[in-house]
Amino acid sequence: MILVDSDVLIAHLRGVVAARDWLVSARKDGPLAISVVSTAELIGGMRTAERREVWRLLASFRVQPATEVIARRAGDMMRRYRRSHNRIGLGDYLIAATADVQDLQLATLNVWHFPMFEQLKPPFAVPGHRPRA
């Protein structure tokens, strides 16, 4: 199963055709998942006019909880990478730990936020997108 990061969902909501096409294609291989962190990020960042579309999108994913095991793994990752990658937030560590503990493939546009996955590549290209550091 693929764990989809918030930035992929945001690209879809902003009408990026490559994001929509990738989501449609990825669903052919089975259900997709998101972290509870992505749920909070999307709800927290949505505009009032987007409410219905955001809720519909979120309902189409399996939501992975942040368990104690995931929290401990996120803490381990944070200790390892906090000096070399000091702009990675707790949310991204929790998403990374969810993927690691649940043995899920991670799909993100911000690969720099996930140095713990050395072979990670963005699932699609977004013209003009520059990952945030």
Swiss-Prot record:
Protein's gene: vapC10
Segments forming domain PINc: 2-119
Protein name: Ribonuclease VapC10
Matches recorded under InterPro entries: PIN-like_dom_sf, PIN_dom, Type_II_TA_system_RNase, VapC_family
SUPFAM superfamilies: PIN domain-like
Keywords: Hydrolase, Magnesium, Metal-binding, Nuclease, Toxin-antitoxin system
Lineage: Bacteria, Bacillati, Actinomycetota, Actinomycetes, Mycobacteriales
Assigned GO CC terms: plasma membrane
Gene3D superfamilies, per the entry: 5'-nuclease
Binding site for Mg(2+): 5, 92
Organism per entry: Mycobacterium tuberculosis (strain ATCC 25618 / H37Rv)
A GO MF label: RNA endonuclease activity
EC number: 3.1.-.-
